[in-house]
Curated annotation (Swiss-Prot):
Gene label: Rgl3
All residue ranges annotated as the Ras-GEF domain in the record: 248-503
Subunit structure: Interacts with GTP-bound forms of RIT1, HRAS and MRAS.
Domain-related comment: The Ras-associating domain plays a central role in the activation of Ral-A GDP/GTP exchange activity.
Protein name per the record: Ral guanine nucleotide dissociation stimulator-like 3
Naturally occurring in which organism (per UniProt): Mus musculus (Mouse)
Length: 709
């Protein structure tokens, strides 16, 4: 293909071409368009530099690129060692990062490691290291296996943790000792085994000390204990040292950022996979995703501190309580300056929760400037366009730091962070796992799904690398005050809030608190659906994502509103903001393209109804808060089947399905009862968000086993 200069066609460098099947494996085929330079011949005379003429042509070379899309496990492992790294550089990192979603580590090693022959003992006085000639005799596949194992050990060392013996790591260590003795990979395996054993010994020592010095067990108090509530109402938060808000805004924000950074750096990306994270509340799954659970606990601790400090001591005057609200707004602003979006989101969620939001007299005493800051910060996490604002800002923060780095500058000169709100990525992965099948026709592993998961995990890892640039020192007094801050349960928060400002019967506009103060923020999906491909055409058009209706979008932008009059709370960024805890299913995903199989190439978005299906969220009314589960609702689904599937996802015995009723949650605190025999798809309100609630019928008294933990 040739075109004159200045008339170059604006063609994409990589164009989808179709699929190929080879030995039971499915490959996606693309055409890569690469430019090659060609100048005019040299002028007469040797040694002269060629000068391009004005009519120089642009030459392009088109090459065929194949990427494995689906295959059986044996073929995937074979691709690890024999695949073309230049054509498909993302295969190995994607497989290593996501393999635990479809196969255990031991089985992969069973395919990957050939049984090594016993090496002959070296003669006395002869170095056992390989000579250069022996290295050259290594087979290509053997070198590839060693390379894959080296990447695996460096990037995913926790995959080999299997206490107490760490058998998988032992097998790798033996193989590398035979295949690459003295090499970097063998040394990595040795060091990792030493670290695991040392860590286990340290944990055992700490456990022995704890058992030796721990006193009698404390009596656990229920969250709704009247004793705890009386203490909160009469005495307020009690601690021997200073309270958290006694410290400066900068100090508190920096310590919150320090804790968030440490926890985020420990997050194992594979624990964020939707197939793993969605199993966390099942019986016997308490140990799943511990590093992600730690970030959830920290988020909930911060929201609890805000609630406890603002609602404590009901006898405070409205002006005094307003000062506490203002200080938390300034702390949130400082977190934004530190690029800590995790604590920023936690503080805003607490201030927007109903127990604090309903305090009109306290909000009326807040100064105009903090209110303006609060509105601007709240816009970051606005529900508009499926939380597109927070995603755009996070991407802008990442891009800014790359652009601000001059050529040749040291990485230490780059700004640290940002610390993301992990819930966004968790929900992206959960919804991706829900939307795309694990296997395709012929029981082939859908590796295209794993590639899309890897794109999200890779971004998490990039953010972790950037967060290593933070240089913050711990302040033990502030950390102690944070731990000592009294935590209020959701029921306590609401009761104390009503003591501070009793609900006025003559004020119907006062927001009515729901008991469903959720443990989960909105779970919604924005998956870009691909257009039906024509023969020889592109199977998908990522440039045309489908828009999604975001449940609970604000009617108007807070930045355009006038400050509220005295005695009114500030405008909330959304009509529903009761959540005070980090979602376990987290935040809505953003618009990323998803390639689907021809049989399922059109997946409805959460809150968006197609002619045949819709993704809905179903929660269950219990004492654990709202734990939402996503369900694909088709036009054939009747209420009993939807109730049964929802109970199954909430780990409630299915024989109890007849004891439950399904309600659609409508705007304005209204609910729509779905009759038992009705077709849910047609009985629901299509204009309302796809949020549903399961509630026990009157006269039934089963105890639910579902838990948000």
């Amino acid at each position: 293909m040739e075109r004159t200069a200045g008339k170059e066609l604006a063609l994409a460098p990589l164009q989808d071409w179709g699929e190929e099947t080879e030995d039971g494996a499915v490959y996606s085929v693309s055409l890569r368009r690469q430019r090659s330079q060609r100048s005019t011949p040299e002028r007469s005379g040797e040694g002269q530099t060629p000068i391009p003429a004005t009519d120089t042509f642009l030459h392009y070379r088109t090459s065929k690129v194949r990427a494995l899309r689906a295959a059986r496990l044996e073929r995937l492992v074979h691709e690890l060692v024999s695949g073309d790294r230049e054509q498909d550089p993302g295969f190995v990192p994607a497989f290593l990062a996501t393999h635990r979603a479809f196969v255990p580590t031991a089985r992969v090693l069973g395919f990957l490691l050939p049984p090594p022959p016993p090496p002959p003992p070296p003669p006395a006085g002869v170095d056992s290291k390989r000579t250069e000639g022996q290295d050259l005799n290594f087979s290509k596949n053997l070198r590839a296996v060693v390379s894959v194992l080296g990447s695996w050990l460096r990037n995913h060392p926790q995959d080999f943790r299997d206490p107490p013996d760490h058998q998988n790591l032992g097998n790798v260590r033996i193989f590398l000792g035979w295949a690459a003795p003295g090499g970097a990979e063998a040394r990595e395996a040795e060091k990792l085994l030493e670290d695991f054993l040392k860590e286990a010994k340290g944990e055992q020592t700490e456990e022995e000390k704890r058992l030796a010095w721990s006193g009698p067990p404390r009596i656990a108090q229920t969250p709704g204990s009247e004793f705890a509530e009386d203490c909160v109402e009469e005495e307020g938060p009690s601690s021997e040292g200073p309270e958290l808000l006694d410290f400066s805004v900068d100090d508190v924000a920096e310590q919150l950022t320090l804790m968030d950074v440490e926890l985020f750096l420990r997050v194992r990306s594979c624990e964020c996979l939707g197939s793993m994270w969605s199993q966390r509340d099942r019986p016997g799954a308490a140990g799943i995703s511990p590093t992600v659970r730690a970030t959830v606990a920290q988020f909930n601790t911060v929201t609890g501190c805000v609630l406890g400090s603002v609602l404590a001591a009901p006898g405070l005057a409205a002006s005094q309580r307003a000062q506490r609200i203002e200080k938390w707004i300034r702390i949130a602003q400082r977190c934004r300056e530190l690029r800590n979006f995790s604590s920023l989101r936690a503080i805003l969620s607490a201030l927007q929760s109903n127990p604090i939001y309903r305090l009109k007299r306290s909000w009326g005493a807040v100064s105009r400037e903090p209110l303006s800051v609060f509105r601007k910060l709240s816009q970051i996490f606005s529900d508009e366009d499926n939380h597109l604002s927070s995603r755009a800002i996070l991407s802008q923060e990442e891009t800014t730091e790359d652009d601000d780095c001059p050529s040749g500058s040291l990485p230490s000169k780059l700004p640290p962070g940002p610390v993301p709100y992990l819930g966004t990525f968790l929900t992206d992965l959960v919804m991706l796992d829900t939307a795309l099948p694990d296997t395709l026709k012929g029981n082939l592993i859908n590796f295209e799904k794993r590639r899309k998961e890897w794109e999200i995990l890779a971004r998490i890892q990039q953010l972790q690398q950037r967060c290593q640039r933070y240089s913050l020192s711990p302040r033990p007094p502030i950390l102690a005050a944070l731990r000592a801050q009294r935590q209020l349960s959701e029921e306590q928060s609401y009761r104390v809030s009503r003591v501070i400002e009793p609900p006025a019967a003559s004020c119907p506009s006062s927001p009515r608190i729901r008991r469903r103060i959720s443990l989960t923020k909105r779970l919604s999906a924005k998956l870009s659906r691909e257009k039906n491909s024509s023969p020889g055409g592109s199977p998908g058009d990522p440039s045309s994502p489908t828009s999604s209706v975001s449940p609970g979008s604000p009617p108007s932008s807070p930045r355009n509103r006038e400050p509220p009059p005295p005695g009114s709370p500030p405008a909330s960024p959304g009509p529903q903001s009761p959540s005070t805890k980090l979602s376990l299913t987290m935040d809505p995903p953003g618009p990323w393209p998803v390639t689907l199989t021809p049989s399922s190439s059109r997946v409805p978005l959460l809150g968006q109804q197609t002619s045949e299906a819709r993704v809905i969220r179903v929660s269950i009314n219990n004492n654990h808060g709202n734990l939402y589960r996503s369900i694909l609702l088709t036009c054939q689904d009747k209420a009993p089947s939807v109730v049964q599937r929802a109970l199954e996802k909430h780990n409630v015995p299915q024989p109890w399905a007849r004891d439950y009723q399904l309600f659609q949650v409508l705007p304005g605190d209204r609910e729509l009862l779905i009759p038992d025999g009705a077709n849910v798809f047609y009985a629901m309100s299509p204009a309302a968000p796809g949020d549903f609630l399961l509630r026990r019928k009157e006269g039934t008294g089963h105890t639910l086993s579902a838990s948000p933990t």
